A protein has these predicted regions:
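Alpha-helix initiation/capping motif
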Residues: 22, 74-80, 107, 206, ...
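Hydrophobic transmembrane-helix microenvironments that flank and shape a buried ionizable site
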Residues: 30-32, 65, 248
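Transmembrane alpha-helices and membrane-interface helical segments
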Residues: 40-51, 77-78, 82, 87, ...
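Aromatic-enriched
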Residues: 209-271
């Protein structure tokens, strides 16, 4: 966990952070997927941004974008840091480098065909799939195909709305909460989300919880999400036919709470 979070017992918090996410990491590894890697790279990128080490930070973000396209959403974090032209330049540099790396093993025409196929797939599957996302849950409850583009736009506006509090941008806890909400949003509003994807969202929940002092309602919510996503799911999936939808409801709750927390004023800390 990035050290920007205020903490009194760093070692204990670090241990609890990874225990909280370990179940979803194990599921991701068993499924042979890269979601845990994406989550780790985004956390590393944030840590390097906090230390003003922009070259590795932008590299990690671009790598996540090439693995999972939504990883490019972490570029949003650039608004919090100085030297934005340098951040933009480094990002474009890494995009160019990674986009051309496959030329080591394929021809330019083959690479162009791969990118065209990638674009076709991305543009074509948005209308076909809902996955374990908010769209999937809404569709299963209503029996209708929800307007994904509209709902995605609304959710994006709601997530970005707290950024109008410019006076909080200098607070480490605020930047950490923005990252937490971004990690959760990437999953619950991703039409291709599946069970292994939730390691990313669970990292967001952990970042939210360890962003400042907590009270019993916060602890209960954390345990509720942990049990619903990482524990109960594996036990009841054989009993409830739509058990895959359960994890979304818990992540949705944590996402709404993260938005609420942005209106609070924890003790301010400065770098």
């Amino acid at each position: 966990m990035p050290r920007c979070a205020p903490c009194q017992a760093w070692t204990l918090q670090q241990f609890l952070f990874f225990v909280f996410a370990s179940f979803e990491c194990l599921l991701c590894l068993q499924a042979q997927q890269t979601n845990a890697l994406v989550a780790a790279l985004l956390l590393l990128a944030f840590a390097f941004l906090e230390r003003r080490k922009y070259l590795p930070a932008t590299l990690f973000i671009v790598i996540t974008g090439f693995i999972k396209l939504f990883g490019f959403g972490a570029i949003l974090l650039f608004i919090f840091y100085p030297q934005k032209p340098k951040l933009a330049l480094y990002t474009l540099l890494w995009i160019a480098v990674l986009a051309l790396v496959p030329l080591v093993v394929v021809s330019p025409s083959e690479l162009w065909g791969i990118y065209e196929a990638w674009q076709t797939q991305i543009l074509g599957d948005h209308a076909k799939y809902a996955g374990m996302s908010f769209f999937g849950m809404l569709g299963s409850f209503s029996g209708m195909n929800p307007p994904k583009t509209l709902l995605l736009g609304i959710s994006l506006v709601l997530m970005l709305l707290p950024l109008i509090q410019i006076q909080k941008w200098k607070q480490p806890w605020f930047r950490q909460l923005v990252l937490a909400a971004l990690l959760i949003w990437m999953v619950i509003f991703n039409h291709k989300a599946e069970s292994p994807s939730y390691v990313i969202a669970m990292m967001g929940v952990a970042l939210w919880f360890f962003s400042g002092p907590r009270h019993w309602p916060d602890v209960l919510l954390l345990l509720f999400v942990f049990a619903g996503v990482s524990l109960l799911f594996s036990d009841i999936t054989q009993v409830i036919s739509k058990g895959l939808r359960l994890s979304l409801s818990f992540e949705g709750t944590s996402f709404l709470l993260a938005l609420e927390l942005w209106q609070r004023h924890p003790p301010e800390t400065t770098r």
